[in-house]
């Protein structure tokens, strides 16, 4: 629509069959074709466009950009050479070092022996993945050599042409997403999103908030500064997304994507900025200054994006979250406070937060911390009855939080799954790590799904509910347009 407003005809190529019913009036002409080099070039040969935009189709069009340009297609916006610099592992690492910024230590491996050697250098835990993935497919977090061997031999096919990437996993880090638009001179920060789940959960599966709810203003300013450095260095024209991780006040860049990300619609709704439209105009030569968009808009209200999962339809799928994306949709909650926005997003996703009853808690060792103590005290004060497995129960009791101990399944009856089946549990908080522990606790999460019991597989998500209890049963409904009248 942006290019149509500027006096150009717009042509869309979409491989989704649903495009015939959803996008038929969005462009002047719509092609329902596979996104392959041959099919796209056939359309280009017929239409002879003045410009080809590859930023709005996710990862697939980016991979075609260089071949299309080599074949004579007039790519507008960020050029293929810049796309390669962001996508290529070694080129990106060199750029990070040149800018004197931080990145999780990483190596590549083309066989099992090389992976074991490089893992020692990178240090466990590791995020392991094939070199080219969509939606985090075949990505895992491994904690030792045995798990790495299993991954290398069973999960992926490795070769010189298809190496496996080994990244040091930043445990207990806060992940941050930024969407921005650049015209090559000025950069508009669309929105900085703080994730609720820790780094290591796929960004599509993590809830996130605009504005940030816990990061200091100083950290946010530094993240934005680094974002602008990457954007300038890459020569971005149009949209760009970057993901960062913050641990102990140190900022690590995870990746930079010179394209529209899945968060653009959320950011646009939360801020009132039509980022896709602004970026399209930038790519056809209308600067940010000419459009009147130079300053970041920080809303005076909170918006929380929440994922929607299909686990009730697939009870054999483990609902524990990790690097591989499992959500199939998303919702948005808006409120004057983070707590109000968060509980609205939970309700919209079909998650009921109980206000009393029995809560089962079993957490991994790194989660036995101040957040768990605060959460336990809060639940106890709210008249919840806490039940926990031995290690978690000992930790809570040592910190003067009353709880009842119950067996894990492998410890024999009476155990937690029996209690869940009896419909005597209202809330489950179950975090775990390591292949064996995840497999042993699967029955807890599976039974929670079958029984329709609210559960959290990350301490951070459970902790976020603390600020929401004031709004239980007291949800106000407001039009999004009323929040964004100033941003039009």
Give the ranges of each region predicted by the language model.
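ATP-binding N-terminal substructure of ATP-dependent carboxylate-amine bond-forming enzymes
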Residues: 1-101, 110-117, 336-485
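ATP-dependent carboxylate activation and anion-phosphoryl transfer catalytic cores
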Residues: 1-51, 59-62, 74-77, 84, ...
């Amino acid at each position: 629509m942006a290019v149509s407003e500027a006096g150009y005809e717009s042509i869309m190529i979409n491989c989704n069959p649903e495009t015939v019913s959803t996008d038929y009036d969005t462009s002047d002409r719509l092609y329902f074709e596979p996104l392959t080099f041959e099919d796209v070039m056939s359309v280009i040969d017929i239409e002879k466009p003045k410009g080809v935009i590859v930023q709005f189709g996710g990862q697939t069009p980016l991979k075609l950009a260089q071949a299309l340009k080599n074949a004579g297609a007039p790519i507008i916006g960020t050029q293929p050479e810049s796309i390669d610099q962001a996508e290529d592992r070694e080129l990106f690492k060199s750029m990070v070092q040149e800018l004197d910024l931080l990145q999780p230590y990483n190596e590549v491996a083309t066989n099992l022996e090389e992976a074991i050697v490089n893992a020692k250098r990178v240090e466990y835990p590791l995020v392991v993945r094939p070199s080219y993935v969509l939606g985090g497919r075949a990505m895992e977090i491994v904690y030792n050599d045995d798990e790495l061997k299993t991954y290398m031999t069973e999960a992926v096919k490795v070769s010189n042409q298809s190496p496996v990437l080994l990244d040091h996993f930043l445990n207990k880090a806060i992940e941050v997403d930024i969407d921005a638009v650049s015209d090559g001179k000025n950069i508009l920060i669309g929105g900085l999103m703080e994730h609720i789940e820790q780094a290591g959960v796929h960004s599509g599966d993590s809830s996130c908030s605009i504005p940030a709810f816990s990061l200091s203003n100083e950290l946010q300013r530094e993240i934005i500064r680094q974002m602008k450095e990457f954007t300038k260095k890459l020569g971005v024209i149009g949209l760009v997304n970057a993901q960062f991780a913050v641990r102990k006040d140190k900022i690590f860049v995870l990746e930079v994507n010179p394209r529209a990300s899945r968060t653009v619609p959320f950011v646009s709704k939360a801020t009132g900025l039509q980022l896709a439209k602004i970026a399209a105009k930038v790519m056809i030569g209308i600067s940010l200054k000419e459009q009147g968009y130079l300053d970041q808009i920080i809303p005076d209200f909170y918006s929380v994006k929440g994922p929607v999962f299909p686990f009730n339809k697939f009870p054999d799928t483990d609902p524990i979250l990790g690097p591989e994306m499992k959500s199939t949709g998303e919702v948005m909650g808006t409120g004057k406070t983070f707590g109000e926005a968060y509980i609205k997003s939970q309700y919209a996703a079909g998650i009921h937060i109980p206000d009393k009853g029995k809560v089962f808690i079993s957490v991994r060792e790194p989660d036995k911390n101040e957040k768990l103590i605060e959460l336990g005290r809060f639940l106890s004060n709210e008249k919840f009855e806490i039940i926990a497995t031995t290690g978690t129960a000992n930790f809570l009791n040592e910190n003067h939080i009353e709880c009842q101990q119950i067996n894990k399944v492998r410890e024999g009856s009476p155990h937690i799954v029996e209690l869940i089946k009896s419909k005597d549990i209202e809330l489950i908080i179950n975090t775990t790590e390591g292949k064996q522990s995840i497999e042993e606790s699967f029955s807890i999460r599976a039974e929670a799904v079958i029984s329709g019991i609210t559960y959290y597989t990350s301490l951070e998500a459970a902790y976020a509910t603390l600020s929401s209890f004031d709004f239980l049963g007291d949800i106000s409904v407001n039009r999004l347009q009323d929040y964004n009248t100033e941003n039009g």
